[in-house]
């Protein structure tokens, strides 16, 4: 689960990270009332969306006067930002964060991330902040330092010392970086986050270290034990289909194609999307019904897929624990109830798959039962293209 910058800073602040004072506005009228809570001077006006690259897209501006701040808020609110991390349609701005200006002496980058490749928490630090860290790592790898923290022992001061070693920082700067690294590690572990990023981390002219921008991604599987974190979810930042899927325990991600996918298992779902593209089609979604899907889950999955206006649907089920005949019955009943009026191709493999295929063939609903995934993908792409 992603959160807005102002929410991420609220979490960081609760763990002792210094952040500039700021207020959130959802209308221009709120500016007059809330701007007084900030110190006089420059104000950073920041569009709040769940995507990076806001600055280059015009989503971060500096206001010098109240009138200028109000004008910037008016421009941003309800506008659509398109960045390298959004879809081509962009994301609508429903909130704007107003933040006190900071006297910046130096900018850095620091993050903590669950690194599955090493089975550790990786702390990443760079003396170049406020820029895309992937670009820095690619073009100037000597400017990025990484340490791996064993969760059995946790973060230690020597980890922080190692982060700073190559950058020639003074004792006070090293102390500031080590302190920040320790805090973000604690945030990551105690909130079940998968990533905590501060970019840039600013060193002020007085030597104080603070978070100028922040991003936190939380593991959805840990939200049950972090109810206060779960409350931070902003429904406006998610597609309606994604929210509906979550209610029914389905994993759904909306995409830009026109072929709906219903699959059991994340790996199989990704392989299904890949093979659709291989045959020249475009998947409309990632939808994992899970290993224990029943007829109700299949019915809800069909409803969600059809909300997107797809031109065809590919169902790819491997029956391990699940029985393919039960899934076939669910597909048939759902098709009758909902009225699926687009081409539907089903590939069943595993437990009772022969029975399942026969049920589909005998249903009289025009459902195409494919023998394997290659055949299924080629069938659905061809059918969709023929209907254009």
UniProtKB/Swiss-Prot annotation:
Please list the GO terms describing molecular function.
ATP binding; magnesium ion binding; succinate-CoA ligase (ADP-forming) activity; succinate-CoA ligase (GDP-forming) activity
Residues binding Mg(2+), per UniProt: 199, 213
| Biological processes, Gene Ontology terms | succinyl-CoA metabolic process; tricarboxylic acid cycle
Q: EC annotation?
A: 6.2.1.5
Query: What is any Pfam family matched here?
Result: Ligase_CoA
> Can you state which reaction this protein catalyses?
succinate + ATP + CoA = succinyl-CoA + ADP + phosphate; GTP + succinate + CoA = succinyl-CoA + GDP + phosphate
Please tell me which top-level EC class this enzyme sits in. Answer: ligase
| Annotated positions binding substrate | 264, 320-322
What cofactor is needed? Mg(2+)
**InterPro entries attached here?**
ATP-grasp_succ-CoA_synth-type, ATP_grasp_subdomain_1, Succ-CoA_synthase_bsu_CS, SUCC_ACL_C, Succ_CoA_ligase-like_bsu, Succinyl-CoA_synth-like
Key words, A-Z: ATP-binding, Ligase, Magnesium, Metal-binding, Nucleotide-binding, Tricarboxylic acid cycle
Positions of ATP binding: 46, 53-55, 99, 102, 107
ATP-grasp domain residues: 9-244
- What's the superkingdom here? Bacteria
Cofactor binding note of this UniProt entry: Binds 1 Mg(2+) ion per subunit.
For this record, an example GO cellular component is:
succinate-CoA ligase complex
Identify the pathway.
Answer: Carbohydrate metabolism; tricarboxylic acid cycle; succinate from succinyl-CoA (ligase route): step 1/1
* NCBIfam families reported for this sequence: PRK00696.1, sucCoAbeta
What's the stated role of this polypeptide?
A: Succinyl-CoA synthetase functions in the citric acid cycle (TCA), coupling the hydrolysis of succinyl-CoA to the synthesis of either ATP or GTP and thus represents the only step of substrate-level phosphorylation in the TCA. The beta subunit provides nucleotide specificity of the enzyme and binds the substrate succinate, while the binding sites for coenzyme A and phosphate are found in the alpha subunit.
Q: Which family does it belong to?
A: Belongs to the succinate/malate CoA ligase beta subunit family.
Q: Relate the assembly described in the record.
A: Heterotetramer of two alpha and two beta subunits.
Q: What is this protein called?
A: Succinate--CoA ligase [ADP-forming] subunit beta
**Lineage, opening ranks:** Bacteria, Pseudomonadati, Pseudomonadota, Alphaproteobacteria, Rickettsiales
């Amino acid at each position: 689960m992603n959160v807005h910058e102002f929410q991420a800073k609220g979490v960081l602040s609760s763990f002792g990270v210094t952040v500039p004072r700021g207020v959130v506005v959802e209308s221009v009228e709120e500016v007059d009332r809330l701007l007084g809570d900030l110190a006089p001077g420059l104000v950073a006006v920041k569009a709040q969306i769940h995507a990076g690259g806001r600055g280059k897209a015009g989503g971060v501006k500096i206001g010098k006067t109240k009138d200028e701040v109000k004008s910037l808020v008016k421009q941003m609110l309800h506008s659509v930002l398109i960045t390298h991390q959004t879809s081509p349609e962009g994301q609508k701005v429903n909130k704007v964060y107003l933040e006190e200006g900071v006297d910046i002496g130096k900018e850095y980058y620091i993050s903590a991330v669950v690194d599955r490749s090493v089975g550790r928490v990786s702390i990443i630090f760079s003396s170049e902040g406020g820029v895309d860290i992937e670009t820095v790592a690619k073009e100037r790898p000597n400017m990025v330092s990484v340490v791996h923290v064993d969760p059995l022992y946790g973060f230690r001061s020597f980890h922080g010392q190692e982060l700073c070693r190559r950058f020639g920082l003074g004792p006070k700067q090293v102390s500031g970086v080590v302190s920040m690294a320790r805090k973000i590690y604690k945030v990551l572990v105690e909130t079940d986050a998968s990533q905590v990023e501060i970019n840039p981390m600013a060193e002020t002219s007085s030597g104080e270290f603070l978070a100028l921008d922040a991003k936190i991604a939380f593991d959805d599987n840990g939200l049950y034990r972090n109810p206060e974190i779960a409350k931070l979810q902003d429904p406006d930042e998610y597609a309606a289909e994604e929210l509906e899927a979550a209610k029914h325990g389905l994993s759904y991600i909306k995409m830009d194609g026109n072929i709906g996918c219903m699959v059991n298992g994340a790996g199989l779902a990704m392989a299904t999307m890949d093979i659709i593209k291989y045959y020249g089609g475009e998947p409309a979604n990632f939808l994992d019904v899970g290993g224990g899907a029943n007829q109700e889950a299949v019915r809800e999955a069909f409803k969600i897929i059809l909300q997107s206006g797809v031109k065809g649907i590919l169902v790819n089920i491997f029956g391990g624990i699940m029985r393919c005949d039960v899934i076939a019955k669910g597909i048939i009943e759902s098709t009758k109830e909902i009225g699926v009026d687009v081409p539907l191709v089903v590939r069943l493999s595993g437990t009772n798959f022969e029975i399942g295929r026969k049920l589909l063939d005998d249903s009289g609903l025009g459902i195409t039962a494919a023998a394997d995934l290659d055949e299924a993908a080629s069938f659905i792409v061809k059918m969709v293209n023929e209907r254009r």
